[in-house]
Amino acid sequence: MSDAANDTKVRFDPERLTFNEAGLVPAIAQDAETSEVLMLAWMNAESIARTLRTGRVTYWSRSRQAFWVKGETSGHVQELVDLRIDCDRDCLLVLLRQTGPACHTGRRSCFYTGVRDGHEQELMTPQD
């Protein structure tokens, strides 16, 4: 029996993704080695193309309305390992190698607050 995943190769076209009304798609950043979810950001067709072209993960900043090359100013670079598309083509999983903390608060992950027994609990502190 053949492996269907290896039988067909379709050229990736970012325009075939399902973008929201602002032309954006959510992108989940995940450490390729540990599988830890690091952050959620937004990408448009051009930021996806730039990411694939350069290997440096590039998002679209909704607040600044500009491209955001992760680590360009902080040095906390995200290097692309793999890009995956979900089944509905409306969300991306960006597998990457993270240098330093991913969160602007200095924490490894933006998901540093847990909810325990109805209360918020800080699960990690900023890295030095």
UniProtKB/Swiss-Prot annotation:
The keyword Zinc applies. It catalyses: 1-(5-phospho-beta-D-ribosyl)-5'-AMP + H2O = 1-(5-phospho-beta-D-ribosyl)-5-[(5-phospho-beta-D-ribosylamino)methylideneamino]imidazole-4-carboxamide. Binds 1 Mg(2+) ion per subunit. One of its GO terms (molecular function) is magnesium ion binding. Zn(2+) binds at residues 87, 103, 110. It is an enzyme of class 3 (hydrolase). Belongs to the PRA-CH family. This is Phosphoribosyl-AMP cyclohydrolase. It comes from Roseobacter denitrificans (strain ATCC 33942 / OCh 114) (Erythrobacter sp. (strain OCh 114)).
